[in-house]
Amino acid sequence: MTPNSMTENGLPAWDKQKPRPDRGQDWKLVGMSEACLHRKSHVERRGALKNEQTSPHLIQATWTSSIFHLDPDDVNDQSISSAQTFQTEEKKCKGYIPSYLDKDELCVVCGDKATGYHYRCITCEGCKGFFRRTIQKSLHPSYSCKYEGKCIIDKVTRNQCQECRFKKCIYVGMATDLVLDDSKRLAKRKLIEENREKRRREELQKSIGHKPEPTDEEWELIKTVTEAHVATNAQGSHWKQKRKFLPEDIGQAPIVNAPEGGKVDLEAFSHFTKIITPAITRVVDFAKKLPMFCELPCEDQIILLKGCCMEIMSLRAAVRYDPDSETLTLNGEMAVTRGQLKNGGLGVVSDAIFDLGMSLSSFNLDDTEVALLQAVLLMSSDRPGLACVERIEKYQDSFLLAFEHYINYRKHHVTHFWPKLLMKVTDLRMIGACHASRFLHMKVECPTELFPPLFLEVFED
């Protein structure tokens, strides 16, 4: 009997043979039979489709009929377009497969093609999504099996029994604790996107050689340091108009022999000591305007100030070097020559300060760069006797990083500007060390009453 032949009741003969439950028949068994028939017909249809796709005769017949009434040019264009579309769709269907998977690795739940390691198991996208939805929405209590929990789960039957599918997910080892709720999932996705964007920016910067500029947080730090410097820097940018030159006859007649071949002019020395106290006070005020410095213990603050005071005063004098008059302006008010500073008590230290001033004149530093140099000198963690060494080192690193990024922002046209500028920190540290040695000789050779109390307090050990 063919499928199209009819019975007396007008029904197909194959339909008549289909079992129909009586009132007392077990509905559960009938349901199982219908499910099996459904699966069988589904598999048969898939098999037929597969044979249909792979049959060379069918492909040839279909191709011939589709181009029978087309011009040769149309055939070429449409065949190329069809091939390209097929390749594109094929790529979409394949999707992304991680490199750690074997070529044809299967889902441990249903046997479909696996796409990755999901919730501690290698699964397909379908089982991953089913497991995630079940946990997120707490659906598993509502699942029930019609066949006593004995369903076989494969890629054909996986959608027919949720309870058995979920039980198999648990059995193979999928972890419920790894499923995130909506808020955590969104936060994780946001974090992943931010990290991707960050890596993208870093790669872009590397590719085009772009140097990072200050972040918002670093700009706040830079602003604080700059304001502290401007507020404590005597005369500011008007120092040239307000300076007064030390008379030429002062500092030219040495009257006290000092060690190391230097001379001390007591008149010049007395002039310098008059401006030294306000100069030291301004350095202390600069430090106290920095929140990081104020957070340190009092003992560490004193050690840092005593260590950097001469270095910062030398820097402030060096950036006010005037090549026309060949003078340095001390504390924003007194312009002195190299000889006057040397004979006034500093000896060879004056040469180092003048050489630094001549060198820095080509750097064209602004107030912010001078301020950041001072902050780096202040937060030197290698000063003897410090308690919070790691903390101070961290603070200096913050200043250095902000400083470097600010240099990038300024875009100086000096080759290797940043490393050259860092070398000036070394020069200033050397000046501080030389002055400490020179101070001992000055105490021996000069009358004690000429030394201001603050000068002695800062530079005496």
Curated annotation (Swiss-Prot):
The UniProt entry's GO CC annotations, sorted and at most eight, read: nuclear body; nucleus; RNA polymerase II transcription regulator complex
Q: Where is this region: Modulating?
A: 1-106
- Which CDD domains does the record associate with it? NR_DBD_TR (cd06961), NR_LBD_TR (cd06935)
Instruction: Identify the residues that bind Zn(2+) 1.
Output: C107, C110, C124, C127
Q: Where is this region: Disordered?
A: 1-24
Matching InterPro entries: NHR-like_dom_sf, Nucl_hrmn_rcpt_lig-bd, Nuclear_hormone_rcpt_NR1, Nuclear_hrmn_rcpt, ThyrH_rcpt, Znf_hrmn_rcpt, Znf_NHR/GATA
Gene Ontology MF, one:
nuclear receptor activity
Binding sites annotated in the UniProt record for Zn(2+) 2: C145, C151, C161, C164
Query: Which of this chain's residues are annotated to bind 3,3',5-triiodo-L-thyronine 1?
Result: H435
- Location relative to the cell: Nucleus
Source organism's superkingdom? Eukaryota
Q: Which UniProt keywords apply?
A: DNA-binding, Metal-binding, Nucleus, Receptor, Transcription, Transcription regulation, Zinc, Zinc-finger
Question: Which residues are listed for 3,3',5-triiodo-L-thyronine binding in this entry?
Answer: R282, N331
Question: Record's SMART domains?
Answer: HOLI (SM00430), ZnF_C4 (SM00399)
Basic and acidic residues bias locations: 15-24
Q: Where is this region: Interaction with NR2F6?
A: 244-461
Q: What is known of its domains?
A: Composed of three domains: a modulating N-terminal domain, a DNA-binding domain and a C-terminal ligand-binding domain.
Give the protein family.
Belongs to the nuclear hormone receptor family. NR1 subfamily.
- Subunit text: Binds DNA as a dimer; homodimer and heterodimer with RXRB. Interacts with the coactivators NCOA1/SRC1, NCOA2/GRIP1, NCOA7 and MED1/TRAP220 in a ligand-inducible manner. Interacts with the corepressor NCOR1 in absence of ligand. Interacts with C1D. Interacts with NR2F6; the interaction impairs the binding of the THRB homodimer and THRB:RXRB heterodimer to T3 response elements. Interacts with PRMT2 and THRSP. Interacts with TACC1; this interaction is decreased in the presence of thyroid hormone T3.
Q: What is this protein called?
A: Thyroid hormone receptor beta
